[in-house]
Each structure stands twice: as structure tokens, then as C-alpha cells.
Amino acid sequence: MDKLVIEGPCQLEGSVQISGAKNAALPILMGCLLSETPVVLSNVPHLKDVTTTIQLLATMGVEVMFDEELNIEIDASNITTKEAPYELVKTMRASILTMGPLLARFGEAKVSLPGGCAIGSRPVNIHIEGMQKMGAEIKVEQGYIIATADRLVGADITMEPVTVTGTENLLMAAVLAEGRTTLRNAAKEPEVSDLAHFLNKMGAKITGIDTDTLVIEGVEKLTGVSYRVIPDRIEAGTYLAAAALTKSCVTVKDVVPEHLTAVLDKFTEAGALVTTTDNTITLDMRNRSLKPVNIVTDPYPAFPTDMQAQFVVMNCLAEGEANVEETIFENRFMHVSELVRMGADIHVEGNVAHTKGVDHLIGAPVMATDLRASASLILAGLVAKGETVVSRIYHIDRGYELIEEKFHKLGAHIYRAN
């Protein structure tokens, strides 16, 4: 099994190209099931979850082709089965997003209950209840959600609590439903908005994008388009955190700075000099001291849960004490015990991680437990004294494209080993 080996401490310098957002690409790939003609997607990151999604679509009879620029053409005109099997769904929670499109276009869907990261319970009840309100008959049998409907009918649905995948699934179900659907307390994440823009380009009628109330007027059919996936704000934030930790100056390119407003505010509070253009962000931490920052994670546009682990590492080396409170998912401090092995002073109480800054971290063998936790261990390795070996990095490969190559280009001493 692959490991990442990092020789620290590292000084970083230069710029890094940010990939397309995994959390936008996955629902958009599923959304291609709604189109009766081929769709061409660009800026899709080459990640394990994307490969799994393409395999999942292929098992349904979807034709998938890549061109020389690695754009993906998806033709869902001749689907042979409306089932998402356990073998593929178990590795990736986003597979549940096949349910809305299949039910909307074909009136039937059979989707295995999902797997993915080991973070909290993440219930799928909101998806099921929403589709039932739209007229679907749903039963859960032998680990599968089996849904049928003649044609979905528009409904007024309030989602409690806010759910990103729930919003996306019901949005895709609603675009071909008869009449108007209103989704209240909808997630406002940029990735949800990207899916909505994609659906509209295919012929959907969605208004209220970027707000917590989405209104969808059902249409008869959607047709294929060319579409470019938005950049990955969490990948961008991770490289900026690496710059802050290593007291370096790094520019992330091909980003949307407005998607990171809450994060950039915290970098500034931590003592960094942050400058932006239309599509770049530069963080300069040279000759500056890292200050502790208190953080509470909340749905967008507040501070994202997917940047929490990176800021815990920053707080480990900041001058003073700080609290990071996680309100979105359970079990999201699994990286803490590994950071403690590297010399960090962190105490977890419930959903709060309390850190006291230390002078330095020491390299150690550590184990990744989930996607963002594994990124935080790499960041710790970049700044720690000596060798850090991060194992179980298949978690990293689910969400970060070419991570060792990108860090290597910035000057890090990092390589992949078996």
C-alpha cells in the first residue's frame, strides 16, 4: 500500500495550479444521467472518486470517452440498468446522487446504501423523504433503496438539517418533475450552485441559486452541453495552509477567491498577508509569526468543515492557545492522536479541539483516517523536523490530484513509496 514520505522542515515557493472541485464534479457527473444527448465536461479532477463514478455510470450502460485534453464525454442516451450496485457504492457516499436523476428520467432507481469516509452518521433520510413528497414510492430492502414513480410531481420541501447531497439529489429529481418544486433550507455551497448552473445550461429552470431557497420549474427533458467544473476551494485552502505553516509565499492559480472568503479571513487573522486577483490567491508568511485562531465550522458561507484539520495543524505551531469547534460532522478529530505523536499539544473535549502552540513538531510514522485528516498530516510533515511517513494515503487520492507532484514543484521534499 502506498505511503507518502516527507523530509521536513520544508520551505515552499512558487505557484500551484488548482484542480477542478471533486465535490462539484461528482454531482455533475451524476447529473449527466438526466441528459438525452451527450455531455462534455472539462476541468474534472483525476481522482479515485471520479474514477469510481465513471465506473458506476459505465455499469449502467453510459458511454464514457476521454479526448486528448482529458475532457470527458458522457452519453447516457442508452442506459441499460437503473441500479447502483453495492460493490461501487460502498466506497463512495456520492453514489446516492444517482437516485434523483434515475428516478426523474426513468421513473425507477435501485441504489445501495452508501459508504465513503468514516465521518459520522450522515443520514440519507432527507433524500428519501423529499422524493416521497414528490410522489415516489420508496422501500429499503436488503441494503438497497428501491424507488419508483410514474412522473415526479413538484413539492414544497424543507430540509432539516442543511444537507449538501440532499439538496443536490432533490434538485436533480425536481428538474424533470411536473410543476414547481421549492427546496427550502437548501445548501448554498459553491458546488451546489455549480450543479444548478450546469442543469440550467442543459435546459432546467432553476432560480434562487446561491440562496437557501431553490425554486425549480419542471421541464420535459434536458439535452447535452459543454461545461467546465469550478476549481476546488478546499485544495486551494490546503496549499495556502501549507504556505502559512512553512512561513513561505505561495500563489494558488485558477481559483475563485470569493469561494474562500471565510477561510482567507482566518488566514489574515493568523498573521498572513493575503492578496487576491480575479483568479489567484497569494499567501505570504515570510518573516511573520503564526497567531492562534478560534474556529467554528458551519455551512457555507461560514468556515468549512473541510478546512478544519488544516487549521488545527496551524494552531499547533501558533504562539498561544486556540479552540476549533466542529459542528458539521461527528468523529472529525481523528487526525489529533496522530498529531500528538508528532509532538502537538491538543486536547479534544466533545466537538472542540483545544490547542496550545508548541515550538516545533517532530517527524513520525502516522496513519491517515479520512480525506482531510490525511491532508493535515502531510502539512504537519512539511513543517516537522525529520522524516514523516503517512500511510493509508488512498484517502488522499480520493480528494487531491497529484498532491506530491504539486508539493514537489513548490520545493517540498516529498515522495511516494510502496
Curated annotation (Swiss-Prot):
Its main location: cytoplasm. Keywords: Cell cycle, Cell division, Cell shape, Cell wall biogenesis/degradation, Cytoplasm, Peptidoglycan synthesis, Pyruvate, Transferase. Coiled coil: none annotated. Pathway: Cell wall biogenesis; peptidoglycan biosynthesis. Phosphoenolpyruvate binds at residues 22-23. Transmembrane segments: none annotated. GO terms for cellular component: cytoplasm. Its EC number is 2.5.1.7. The modification 2-(S-cysteinyl)pyruvic acid O-phosphothioketal is found at residue 117. One of its GO terms (molecular function) is UDP-N-acetylglucosamine 1-carboxyvinyltransferase activity. InterPro entries: Enolpyruvate_Tfrase_dom (IPR001986), Enolpyruvate_Tfrase_sf (IPR036968), MurA_subfamily (IPR050068), RNA3'P_cycl/enolpyr_Trfase_a/b (IPR013792), UDP_GlcNAc_COvinyl_MurA (IPR005750). It is found in: Cytoplasm. GO terms for biological process: cell division; cell wall organization; peptidoglycan biosynthetic process; regulation of cell shape; UDP-N-acetylgalactosamine biosynthetic process. The keyword Cytoplasm applies. Belongs to the EPSP synthase family. MurA subfamily. NCBIfam families: murA, PRK09369.1. This is UDP-N-acetylglucosamine 1-carboxyvinyltransferase. The lineage of its organism: Bacteria, Pseudomonadati, Pseudomonadota, Gammaproteobacteria, Thiotrichales. The gene is murA.
